[in-house]
From Swiss-Prot:
The gene is rbfA. Belongs to the RbfA family. Residues 118-133 have a biased composition (Basic and acidic residues). Residues 118-140 are annotated as: Disordered. Pfam families: RBFA (PF02033). Monomer. Binds 30S ribosomal subunits, but not 50S ribosomal subunits or 70S ribosomes. It comes from the Bacteria. This is Ribosome-binding factor A. HAMAP family: RbfA (MF_00003). Its main location: cytoplasm.
Length: 140
């Protein structure tokens, strides 16, 4: 059982590398553009592979169009990858948009903005305290 799991994991890793190369070098469809293969999950019987991809665009309409183009080209991509990998059964490819990278960038930007706002408030507060202490010293 553990051996089967490690085999599917190894196949998924190799499939991820081969897919990345094929999508980068061999697919010339302008609708797809720059695509990154983040992860691949292969079913236990190797009949399906879920391919998690990201694009440089964040617009949901463009992402849908690119996913549709990838889905249309999946048979061709599958045949190219099958030529590179020596598997008895080449998994059927299902492309899924991986929003984790975009979500991570959004969260990072939020944290950066909050830190910046907090520092600005702290500086404003420290500047106000210095003025108050200067005023109280002048009254004595």
């Amino acid at each position: 059982m553990a051996r089967e799991f490690s085999r599917t994991r190894r196949i998924a890793q190799q499939l991820q590398q081969e897919l990345a190369q094929v999508l980068q070098r061999d697919i010339k469809d302008p609708r797809i553009g720059m695509v990154t293969v983040n992860d691949v999950e292969v079913s236990r019987d190797l009949s399906y592979a879920k391919v998690f991809v990201t694009f440089f665009e964040e617009d949901s309409k463009l992402v849908e169009e690119k996913l549709e183009a990838l889905t249309t080209a999946s048979g061709y991509v599958r045949s190219l990858v099958a030529g590179r990998m020596k598997l008895r059964v080449m998994p059927e490819l299902r492309f899924v948009y991986d929003a984790s990278l975009v979500e991570g960038m959004r969260m990072s930007n939020l944290v950066t903005r909050i830190i910046h706002d907090d520092e600005a408030k702290q500086q404003k507060h420290n500047g106000k305290d210095k003025t108050d202490t200067a005023d109280s010293e002048g009254e004595e």
